[in-house]
């Protein structure tokens, strides 16, 4: 399903000011927030609104979106890597129309092989504990990636040697090829397979990188994890991808987070949930109970007559929003626990309570014979 235009999502014009964008976002996010709107589809609508605001409220992202739309140059939406298990890191990219045209006609239009090209982007999967994701942290990672060859400094030739005119294409950087196609015999030009379009070849290739200009090494990087990141979210480390070609910029490294669940809380976005068991006397008479929060412990007042399923909301006791939109809430869900083992004295008190409440409790199990006698006696 195609994404809707971000301006359409927020109901604003393409020349809307920042204040108009913010005003539209606040109005719509309040209307479709999952805690307020329980209608089907409200959650997805809220995510769509948040995604649109994240892009349009940022000058650089907005300018890029206005120029390229949803599909470029890096795409938008924060969650760009689905839920797949990446298992470490890998390069990613893809060909455009020119590549398809080239493969079909045996050449066709060719990009300038000597033009600067950005290096490949990489992805790395980082596992975080619940606490690391909530409070942020700094972690050192080790990845294997292509880096500029230290021996030849990316030139590809052995130091002290020079390059010469390519013997295959005579320095043209491309060669003529004739192929049979559905349109008949077609003569096209292709990038020279020997010099890759440079028009030159080495007298002697670099002994370290064998002419590639890059070598694969293990690199250590320090990654600053922001507060409030959630599972499947990612951050971009600009320039930490593969080296560029022909003087082009390096690609980027995308760090995708896998967050382990908490043993204490259940997370839903920026909100967290805590299950609190209370005894029958506490629920009936009321009490003050100490409960955990993300930073410390607080006293929660349980009113008399509290029932199972009652939920208490502690505002802004949740997780800090990763984009800086305040804090989520802490929800405490109550479960009244029925005692399973009672002393004789406790049983007497419970029976007395039942009698005062007008209830008759028969806690003596009867066998089939006794039940049959009472049945025929009309009891």
UniProtKB/Swiss-Prot annotation:
The keyword Transport does not apply. InterPro entries: DnaJ, DnaJ_C, DnaJ_domain, DnaJ_domain_CS, HSP40/DnaJ_pept-bd, HSP_DnaJ_Cys-rich_dom, HSP_DnaJ_Cys-rich_dom_sf, J_dom_sf. The keyword Zinc applies. SMART domains: DnaJ (SM00271). Zn(2+) 2 binds at residues 166, 169, 192, 195. CXXCXGXG motif repeats lie at residues 149-156, 166-173, 192-199, 206-213. Coiled coil: none annotated. CDD domains: DnaJ, DnaJ_C, DnaJ_zf. It is found in: Cytoplasm. It comes from the Bacteria. Its cofactor is Zn(2+). Zn(2+) 1 binds at residues 149, 152, 206, 209. Binds 2 Zn(2+) ions per monomer. Residues 5-69 form the J domain. Its main location: cytoplasm. GO terms for biological process: chaperone cofactor-dependent protein refolding; DNA replication; protein refolding; response to heat. Pfam families: DnaJ, DnaJ_C, DnaJ_CXXCXGXG. One of its GO terms (molecular function) is ATP binding. SUPFAM superfamilies: Chaperone J-domain, DnaJ/Hsp40 cysteine-rich domain, HSP40/DnaJ peptide-binding domain. Belongs to the DnaJ family. The J domain is necessary and sufficient to stimulate DnaK ATPase activity. Zinc center 1 plays an important role in the autonomous, DnaK-independent chaperone activity of DnaJ. Zinc center 2 is essential for interaction with DnaK and for DnaJ activity. Participates actively in the response to hyperosmotic and heat shock by preventing the aggregation of stress-denatured proteins and by disaggregating proteins, also in an autonomous, DnaK-independent fashion. Unfolded proteins bind initially to DnaJ; upon interaction with the DnaJ-bound protein, DnaK hydrolyzes its bound ATP, resulting in the formation of a stable complex. GrpE releases ADP from DnaK; ATP binding to DnaK triggers the release of the substrate protein, thus completing the reaction cycle. This is Chaperone protein DnaJ. It comes from Staphylococcus aureus (strain MRSA252).
């Amino acid at each position: 399903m195609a994404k809707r235009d971000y301006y359409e999502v927020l109901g604003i014009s393409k020349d809307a000011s920042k204040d108009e964008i913010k005003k539209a976002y606040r109005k719509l996010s309040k209307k479709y927030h999952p805690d307020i709107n329980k209608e089907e589809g409200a959650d997805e609508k809220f995510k769509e609104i948040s995604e649109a605001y994240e892009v349009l409220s940022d000058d650089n992202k907005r300018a890029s979106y206005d120029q390229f739309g949803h599909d470029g140059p890096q795409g938008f939406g924060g969650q760009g890597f689905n839920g797949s298990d990446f298992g470490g890191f890998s390069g990613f990219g893809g060909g455009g129309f020119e590549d398809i045209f080239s493969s079909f006609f045996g050449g066709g239009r060719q990009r300038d092989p000597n033009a600067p090209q950005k290096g490949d982007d990489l992805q790395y999967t980082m596992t975080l504990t619940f606490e690391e994701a909530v409070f942020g942290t700094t972690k050192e990672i080790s990845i294997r990636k292509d880096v500029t060859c230290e021996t030849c400094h990316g030139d590809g030739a052995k130091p002290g040697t020079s390059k010469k005119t390519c013997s295959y294409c005579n320095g043209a950087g491309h060669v003529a090829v004739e192929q049979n196609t559905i349109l008949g015999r077609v003569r096209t030009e292709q990038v020279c397979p020997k010099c890759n379009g440079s028009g030159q070849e080495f007298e002697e290739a670099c002994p370290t990188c064998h002419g590639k200009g890059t070598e694969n090494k293990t690199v250590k990087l320090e990654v600053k994890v922001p507060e409030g990141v959630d599972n499947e979210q990612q951050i971009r480390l600009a320039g930490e991808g593969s080296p560029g070609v022909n003087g082009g910029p390096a690609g980027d490294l995308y760090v995708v987070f896998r967050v382990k669940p908490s043993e204490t809380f259940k997370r839903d976005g920026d909100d967290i949930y805590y299950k609190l068991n209370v005894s029958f006397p506490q629920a009936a008479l009321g009490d003050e109970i100490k409960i955990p929060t993300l930073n410390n412990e607080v006293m929660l007042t349980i009113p008399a007559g509290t029932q199972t399923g009652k939920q208490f909301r502690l505002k802004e006791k949740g997780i800090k929003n990763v984009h800086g939109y305040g804090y989520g809430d802490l929800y405490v869900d109550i479960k009244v626990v029925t005692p399973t083992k009672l002393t004789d004295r406790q049983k007497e008190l419970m029976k007395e309570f039942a009698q005062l409440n007008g209830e008759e409790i028969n806690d003596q199990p009867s066998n089939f014979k006794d039940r049959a006698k009472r049945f025929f006696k009309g009891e």
